[in-house]
Amino acid sequence: MEEVEAANRSAIESCHGVLNLLSQRTSDPKSLTVETGEVVSKFKRVASLLTRGLGHGKFRSTNKFRSSFPQHIFLESPICCGNDLSGDYTQVLAPEPLQMVPASAVYNEMEPKHQLGHPSLMLSHKMCVDKSFLELKPPPFRAPYQLIHNHQQIAYSRSNSGVNLKFDGSGSSCYTPSVSNGSRSFVSSLSMDASVTDYDRNSFHLTGLSRGSDQQHTRKMCSGSLKCGSRSKCHCSKKRKLRVKRSIKVPAISNKIADIPPDEYSWRKYGQKPIKGSPHPRGYYKCSSVRGCPARKHVERCIDETSMLIVTYEGEHNHSRILSSQSAHT
């Protein structure tokens, strides 16, 4: 370890000698190159001493990072020559203050504290800022940010959805949205000082204004007569009429499926359908007393009592009662 410490001390002393040469105004490039080579060789010796007992250790030299700045600006000594800096180096300029600042914020002129050989390389931050600037409040609108006309208004309204947006630039920097639908309305005021003024105690209350409810009044139901503009089959949505159903239990007159108890109307059978879990099918009948009558009924045998029939009527007759001797035609 003593040998490593001695080699390290010698390398550091040589490095200080190179730094002193760099800080001088007039330095010979040849001597600087020689001193730098000696420093590198001494540090390599230190690295070889450190890796001597670690087996097959290898010293890998990486590419040196080349900075675009001259090396003597990083020295502690402030003695630098302004002529050494060329115009090719990147100039570090002091950041300009923001444009939108409060009226109470006062910025003094920048006074250089440390000048490093070039007028553009200066570090200074002397600035008097009002306390209100630290509260991060957006400044009020001034004349350049106002609209050209004081009473210019941009309004967007839609009657179906009931949305009315109004932007008013007359004197105040206030955005007032209003959403109204009938008797429900609210007005919220957003000012630029991050305060919300709500006149209805419901700030940002989004009411679900459904378009479907408004469009239901304007949508016309298609009658199926191909008047909706389509040449082929009409695909318009039709509302299925809600038919009133009523069921009664009557005794069966025979064991035949076609025999049904008579009533005051004439019926014609137009189909039947098997019932799951029952050996007897369900018969479907339509009123045949008057042509075009919408009344229907279906008859099925009761599962619990085979001697009883369940008759379910659907729809209403559009004619008066007609007594008939023959109740069903098979």
Curated annotation (Swiss-Prot):
SUPFAM superfamilies: WRKY DNA-binding domain. It is found in: Nucleus. One of its GO terms (cellular component) is nucleus. The keyword Acyltransferase does not apply. InterPro entries: WRKY_dom, WRKY_dom_sf, WRKY_plant, Zn-cluster-dom. Its main location: nucleus. Coiled coil: none annotated. Keywords: DNA-binding, Nucleus, Transcription, Transcription regulation. GO terms for molecular function: calmodulin binding; DNA-binding transcription factor activity; sequence-specific DNA binding. This is Probable WRKY transcription factor 39. It comes from Arabidopsis thaliana.
